[in-house]
Amino acid sequence: MGLPWYRVHTVVLNDPGRLLSVHIMHTALVSGWAGSMALYELAVFDPSDPVLDPMWRQGMFVIPFMTRLGITNSWGGWSITGGTITNPGIWSYEGVAGAHIVFSGLCFLAAIWHWVYWDLEIFCDERTGKPSLDLPKIFGIHLFLSGVTCFGFGAFHVTGLYGPGIWVSDPYGLTGKVQSVNPAWGTEGFDPFVPGGIASHHIAAGTLGILAGLFHLSVRPPQRLYKGLRMGNIETVLSSSIAAVFFAAFVVAGTMWYGSATTPIELFGPTRYQWDQGYFQQEIYRRVGAGLAENLSLSEAWSKIPEKLAFYDYIGNNPAKGGLFRAGSMDNGDGIAVGWLGHPIFRDKEGHELFVRRMPTFFETFPVVLVDGDGIVRADVPFRRAESKYSVEQVGVTVEFYGGELNGVSYGDPATVKKYARRAQLGEIFELDRATLKSDGVFRSSPRGWFTFGHATFALLFFFGHIWHGARTLFRDVFAGIDPDLDAQVEFGTFQKLGDPTTRRQVV
């Protein structure tokens, strides 16, 4: 039958065997993509510098997801946290990728088998002899099995009872490692940044799923509810499944973009709000202040700042700086970070310490303005020299570096001072290698941005899909223009399959 492209899926209506087949094939494609993508990423990933060239700077997408679930070692002899290892075991990055590819192959074969052997006895209604599915019963089975999986993940994998645990870090993404997590059963479990909530919520949701599954297996739906919600129609299943998927996609888009314990910044990069709020800058200043309180010199206090913390406080790591259509990793944008030059402190000739006003997230260009501790403008890089009052030359601004590669170095010539003032707009100053990857100097987003954009977009599309298929199944008789209880001569439209020979006919 000549079906248009948008109606080809009607071939699996009233055909349970082949409906199962196409779903198994879909699983094969998803699993095969995941395994293949993992192998590709492992082929191009450089594990040599986990501090300045982490996975998220290199544009890795599936490696962070494996890592947060407890995979840290490679058969190549490296660990994601740095250093070398001798016995990575079977569940390395390559082991997980291989398992997905093997599983994909098995699903591929199973899909072919079920396509060929579609007319199985199990799909046949013994009362009518026609193919049919007991959808409420199948719903109960799926709910029970997903509940068992959910409970098992929370109770065993996350807690380390039988499994590796998950990636856990401090609030500033400095000490992350895979460790077991105890369930948080108090109110703290509702804090999205508390890892214990992951364990407790999976245990609770899994328990609920098991109980709900058993309920749906043992209790039949009332006839009026069954008919009212069209529980016998496979398109009802499609509609409600799409609802579950788009709801989950909206949720994870939020947890990724705003940050949570499930999306650690060491694996996915910092969030834009950490730049907007000066999150890392405040922690750096707090640590420097603590160092000065211990009678350290300014140079010594800044030298104790971890390079990893300083690197987070750089606008190039803000996922909102990447343009929507700028393909490639962050390293392809501003380059590969090589080292921290140190923290620049600017002073005018009167001795005021000056602070460069930082660039907001959604600006591509921003005026270079230097203010004192009270927020009063003391110097700038003017657009028009004729009207300048606060130019670096007039005010006599100098810059001195503390910590990093330029520790103790100072500059007084205006051209160099202005160069570092422009760079200080972007946060801490780093030396960036743009030659190796031929980086173009234009900021890119991190996998955090890609994931959010992709899931929010598809969630919206799937929302419309849910409405579409839900309306089709609820108002099928209305759309067909036929009363389902009417014995017409030929009930065009009541039957969903084009050319269905089972269409009821009545001799007049």
Swiss-Prot record:
Membrane topology classification: Multi-pass membrane protein
Record's cofactor remark: Binds multiple chlorophylls. PSII binds additional chlorophylls, carotenoids and specific lipids.
InterPro entries for the chain: PS_antenna-like, PS_II_antenna-like_sf, PSII_PsbB
One GO CC term on file: chloroplast thylakoid membrane
GO biological process: photosynthetic electron transport in photosystem II
Function, in words: One of the components of the core complex of photosystem II (PSII). It binds chlorophyll and helps catalyze the primary light-induced photochemical processes of PSII. PSII is a light-driven water:plastoquinone oxidoreductase, using light energy to abstract electrons from H(2)O, generating O(2) and a proton gradient subsequently used for ATP formation.
Protein name, as recorded: Photosystem II CP47 reaction center protein
Organism per entry: Drimys granadensis
